[in-house]
Amino acid sequence: MPTINQLVRKPRVAEKAKSKVPALEKCPQKRGVCTRVYTTTPKKPNSALRKVCKVRLTNGFEVISYIGGEGHNLQEHSVVLIRGGRVKDLPGVRYHTVRGSLDTQGVKDRKQSRSKYGAKRPKAA
């Protein structure tokens, strides 16, 4: 416990909060170009083939981004928009691709949570 005199000489310094999404540089989203589109397997105890892509951003960062939803149209040189948000069972994946924006199509036949997957409202039958 420091004395008041010690605190006067050298005040307490608050710890700086470290960003969970440094590549976004305080922006809500960033644009980038896919350099590789592939599948990877999650950590134990989960099992699947998760769709991810490596993206070179406009600021020069190269990050891995998760492609959510069923099916996608991304390939190398596709221009994508990424947002923050990690995938808990994929180490190193700290970003999500935004569906329905730029070259990324929305999810087909999506009825619920449509705004998260870039799907238009279905026509009333």
From Swiss-Prot:
The keyword Mitochondrion does not apply. Residues 100-125 are annotated as: Disordered. It holds the Pfam family Ribosom_S12_S23. CDD domains: Ribosomal_S12. Residues 113-125 have a biased composition (Basic residues). InterPro entries: NA-bd_OB-fold (IPR012340), Ribosomal_uS12 (IPR006032), Ribosomal_uS12_bac (IPR005679). One of its GO terms (cellular component) is small ribosomal subunit. The modification 3-methylthioaspartic acid is found at residue 89. SUPFAM superfamilies: Nucleic acid-binding proteins. GO terms for biological process: translation. Keywords: Methylation, Ribonucleoprotein, Ribosomal protein, RNA-binding, rRNA-binding, tRNA-binding. PROSITE patterns: RIBOSOMAL_S12. GO terms for molecular function: rRNA binding; structural constituent of ribosome; tRNA binding. With S4 and S5 plays an important role in translational accuracy. Part of the 30S ribosomal subunit. Contacts proteins S8 and S17. May interact with IF1 in the 30S initiation complex. Belongs to the universal ribosomal protein uS12 family. This is Small ribosomal subunit protein uS12. The gene is rpsL.
